[in-house]
Curated annotation (Swiss-Prot):
The name this protein goes by in its record: Thioredoxin domain-containing protein 11
Any one cellular-component term (Gene Ontology): endoplasmic reticulum membrane
Phylogenetic lineage: Eukaryota, Metazoa, Chordata, Craniata, Vertebrata
Organism: Homo sapiens (Human)
One family name in Pfam for this protein: Thioredoxin
Domain of life: Eukaryota
Length: 985
């Protein structure tokens, strides 16, 4: 049965047996597996067949599994095929470009990027503007109308070509690799490209194109010469005589250098270079500022020799660089080669600028940051039209800059100032340095009946010299029509400001006691129409007694408090200086205004002046404090990054020379009367339903100084911990009565506050108790900000007796005592401050003496260096002359050596000819000798023949009849001589 069953199994049983044997069921199987690898292969194949057979049997028993497996496999194949087909990128070809400009536009539009055609048409035009654009670029689309407007005005002189440099099949895209669009290139014949990087405005583009078309200005007269030299841009003048030639030597080079100046200025980086020149005993740092074409070097041409002598130009082809404060220069042709690149480089490296034009591009930039780090900056926003023939406001700013930097009263600068003021001046003989001319008298100041008597108490340090002063606030028209200026009666606050400034000017009145009247004139603010005068005199005891009896002049003063707080009535006398109303003790005296000329050298807060076009960058002016809606976009601001403050000129005042001078003067003084400008967000409303009051810069005093306890939270949007306190302050506001307590907050990132109210960390909580605002308290930093802690803090520092109901009925005795204590403390504090200031003044005086000694030593060193320089120059001239002599001697010796070499060559040729002739002579001599020997031999033979006639003669060479036979060795000798001759050759 076992055998049948085995056979009955057929192949299946045999395969099972093989599998079992091969699988190592017994010792024999394992030996076979270890000995032969083919058995292992057969075993794995058997297992595969067995698995397939099991799957087939299962599918036959359960056909639904087979169908599911087949469906699953098909789904996997379809998914794999779909995934592989989507792996490749699907690229849609770009649409063909269309015309960017209209067909009626004067601009030639190469919208397919035909750069080769643009180069072809450029060769036939004198001036060409290439406008590279991208059709999708918003800046290119915005500049399209500006380009068309400029082309409509210049199409008869300039070829405008627009090129699509974005289409991937165009040559422009393949050859040009721009990082931004649009890009403007200008070509002047074969010179270029000159890239334009100015504002994309039609007037600016047209002005730039016209400057490329005409890079040189013709100077025909003295008036235009003064216009050229008084311009704020540096000027380079070239003198050329056209009488002898239509194109004098060097003119084309000078013309090309003017084009190079435009190109180099546009290619230069924003980092300025500093050059220091020394003239006399002072120096001025000259900084190169180049941006676009504004502020670049202007080039002019003079053809009149008499006009050229005014600027020290004598020879045709000379080049002159004008500088206002340093010595003007003439191009050193003996040092530098007269090329366009050298002239341009020399002018850019040695130029001197009064102020700089700024053009922020609107993106991230360090332009303003780099300029503000140099020191205080005066920003002037003015509406600028580049195409205008004249710019009166810029002329006034130029006049201010010239006076501000004219530290030594240079006569050339004074003449230029007279020309800017349109003052008739004598005809110029030369622009050489002369004695400084007298400055024009300042405008007179008309005093108005607004004077007050100032009583200096005995505790003041200089009361021993002047203890009675008369303060007068004066009004002046400042050059305007008297009818247009009103003279209002001054207020108490104006007099208080004058008093504050008066005490800051204490050193002005520190003199020996005298009965004479000593007066001084000061500016109270940056308004050119407001001055105050202080006239002081020492009053004796008799005079003092007389004054005491006169209408109570020196009555006990009153102490003024803030109008927003409750005042305590003080009846006791005080030692605080006070102001009397309309008390005239002294007659009117003449007053003189402060001198503005050379102020930059007399202050430690020298200003750098910058100009911005308000038509383009008024947003920056608004951020500095200018009104957003105004008819005339003129604005001035001083920014001092070191002091973290900035000041603005009153927008109600006109931007002109007098206002700018007063503005700069008030900033330059040691104790500036200018008030720091605070920038805040929009005015916040105080609706009744809001529990927390939002405070701004404008509403800070109104909220904090109100007759309530105020808890103020300082926060900022970028402070991550600040929002977590909102619910705490909302609960606090709900728990406290709103009629006696105010919870407020202020965003310090958008609102500036006075320095005494600024904080150094966020969040910060300040508490201002009612009626004691000067005793504000800061919440402890080491205590968590929670509702219970805030309530304890408020209850601890608030005064229950200071409620509004008790304030009106509170006794005045305690208030008077506290105020007396405060006043005594204030007086002692002021005395200490005065002593500190005097010590500082003495130290400054000592430092001044040291600086003067250092300056004197520096002057001596400079004088010594100049002498050494002159000695070196003399040595250099001697060496130069000696070098020229050596050069001439070298050339002479060279010529002699060349002549000697020629003669040696002739001798060599003659020697060669002599050698040849000598050879032939040797041959001839040898031949003659052989002939002689032959004759001797013939004679001997004849004698022998006579002796032996019967002997036969030997055979010889045939001879001519009548000739003697040649010797036997003649031919051999000739051959040897010829061989020698050949070897000699």
């Amino acid at each position: 049965m076992s055998e049948c069953g085995g056979r009955g199994g057929g192949s299946s049983s045999s395969e099972d047996a093989e599998d079992e044997g091969g699988g190592g069921g017994g010792p024999a199987g394992s030996d076979c597996l270890s000995s032969s690898p083919t058995l292992a292969t057969a075993s794995s194949a058997g297992r595969l067949r067995r698995g397939l057979r099991g799957a087939f049997l299962m599918a036959r028993q359960r056909p639904e599994l087979l169908c599911g497996a087949v469906a699953l496999g098909c789904a996997l194949l379809l998914a794999l095929k779909f995934t592989c087909s989507r792996a490749k990128d699907v690229i849609i070809p770009a649409k063909p470009p269309v015309s960017f400009f209209s067909l009626r536009s004067p601009v030639l539009d190469l919208f397919q990027g035909q750069l080769d055609y643009a180069e072809y048409v450029r060769r036939d035009s004198e001036v060409v503007l290439l406008f590279f654009y991208a059709p999708w670029c918003g800046q290119s689309i915005a500049a399209r109308a500006e380009i068309e407007q400029a082309a409509s005005r210049l199409s008869d002189q300039v070829l405008f070509v627009a090129i699509n440099c974005w289409w991937n099949q165009g040559k422009c895209r393949k050859q040009k690799h721009f990082f931004y669009f649009p890009v403007i290139y200008l070509y002047h014949r074969s010179f270029g490209p000159i890239e334009y990087k100015g504002p994309m405005s039609a007037v600016y583009i047209e002005k730039f194109v016209r400057r490329v078309m005409k890079p040189l200005l013709y100077i025909p007269s003295q008036s235009e010469l003064l216009d050229f030299l008084s311009n704020y841009e540096p000027g380079v003048l070239g003198y050329f005589e056209f009488s002898g030639s239509p194109q004098p030597p060097g003119y084309l080079t000078f013309f090309t250098s003017a084009l190079h100046s435009l190109k180099k200025a546009l290619e230069s980086t924003s980092s300025p270079r500093a050059l220091v020149s020394f003239t006399g005993e002072w120096h001025l740092e000259t900084k190169i500022y180049v941006l676009d074409y504004l502020g670049t070097v202007r080039f002019g041409v003079i053809t009149n020799k008499h006009l050229a002598k005014l600027v020290s130009l004598v020879h045709s082809g000379s080049v002159y660089l004008h500088r206002h404060f340093n010595t003007s220069l003439v191009f050193p042709r003996e040092v530098l080669n007269y090329t366009a690149e050298n002239i341009c480089k020399w002018a850019l490296e040695n130029q001197e600028t009064l102020f700089r034009w700024l053009r922020p591009h609107g993106g991230k930039s360090l332009l303003l940051n780099n300029e503000l780090k140099k020191g205080p900056a005066l920003f002037l926003f003015i509406p600028f039209n580049p195409l205008a023939e004249s710019h009166p406001l810029i002329d006034e700013i130029t006049e201010v800059a010239l006076e501000y930097n004219n530290c030594h009263g240079d006569q050339v600068v004074e003449r230029l100032l007279q020309h800017l003021r349109r003052v008739d001046a004598p005809v110029l003989e030369s622009l050489a340095l002369e004695v400084p001319a007298q400055l024009p008298d300042p405008p007179t100041i008309t005093a108005s009946p607004c004077c007050n008597t100032v009583v200096l108490p005995q505790w003041h340090s200089f009361s021993r010299t002047h203890n009675v002063c008369e303060l007068c606030v004066n009004q002046t028209s400042g050059g305007m029509k008297p009818s247009s200026v009103s003279v209002p009666q001054c207020s108490f606050f104006e007099m208080a400001a004058a008093l504050d400034s008066f005490y800051l000017k204490e050193q002005t009145f520190y003199h020996v006691a005298s009965d004479s009247i000593e007066c001084s004139n000061f500016l109270t603010s940056y308004s050119p129409f407001s001055y105050y005068t202080a006239c002081c005199r020492t009053i004796s005891r008799g005079v003092s007694g007389f004054i005491d009896s006169e209408q109570g002049v020196f009555e006990a003063p009153t102490v003024a408090f803030s109008s927003l707080e409750k005042k305590c009535e003080v009846d006791a006398p005080s030692s605080v200086p006070h102001i009397e109303e309309n008390r005239y003790l002294f007659p009117e005296v003449d007053m003189t205004s402060t001198n503005f000329t050379g102020l930059s050298c007399r202050t430690n807060k020298t200003l750098n002046i910058y100009l911005l076009d308000s038509n383009l960058f008024w947003l920056y002016a608004e951020r500095l404090g200018a009104p957003s809606s105004t008819q005339v976009k003129e604005f001035a601001a001083i920014v001092d990054v070191k002091e973290e403050s900035h000041y603005i000129l009153d927008p109600k005042q006109a931007l002109m020379k007098l206002t700018l001078e007063s503005f700069i003067q008030n900033f330059s003084v040691l104790y500036s009367p200018l008030k720091r400008h605070l920038i805040g967000s929009g005015s916040a409303q105080f609706p009744s339903q809001h529990l927390i009051t939002e405070v701004t810069t404008d509403t800070f005093w109104e909220v904090v100084l109100q007759k309530q306890d105020v808890l103020l939270l300082y926060y900022a949007p970028w402070c991550g911990f600040c929002p977590s306190l909102n619910h705490i302050f909302i609960q606090l506001a709900r728990n406290l009565p709103m009629d006696t307590f105010t919870v407020a907050r202020i965003d310090v990132s958008q609102n500036d506050l006075p320095w005494e109210f600024m904080v150094d960390r966020l969040p910060t909580v300040l508490f201002f108790p009612c009626n004691r605002k000067d005793l504000s308290v800061k919440y402890p930093e080491d205590v968590p900000i929670t509702l219970p802690n805030l309530l304890r803090f408020i209850l601890h520092h608030s005064d229950p007796a200071s409620s509004p109901q008790n304030v009106a009925n509170s006794p005045t005795k305690e208030c008077l005592q506290s105020e007396a204590v405060l006043q005594r403390g204030h007086i002692s504090h002021l005395e200490r401050e005065i002593q500190k200031l005097r010590a500082e003044i003495s130290s400054l005086q000592r430092a001044q003496v040291q600086v003067e000694s250092q300056l004197s030593s520096a002057r001596r060193d400079e004088h010594r260096l100049r002498q050494q320089q002159r000695a070196l120059e003399e040595q250099h001239s001697l060496l130069h002359a000696h070098s020229e002599q050596l050069q001439a001697l070298y050339e002479q010796k060279t010529r002699e050596l060349q002549e000697l070499a020629r003669k040696l060559q002739e001798l060599a040729d003659a020697s060669e000819n002599l050698l040849t002739e000598n050879t032939w002579l040797k041959i001839l001599v040898a031949t003659m000798e052989r002939k002689l020997e032959g004759r001797d031999g013939a004679e001997s033979l004849a004698a022998q023949r006579e002796v032996h006639p019967k002997q036969p003669e030997p055979s010889a060479t045939p001879q001519l009849p009548g000739s003697s036979p040649p010797p036997a060795n003649v031919s051999a000798t000739l051959v040897s001589e010829r061989n020698k001759e050949n070897r000699t050759d």
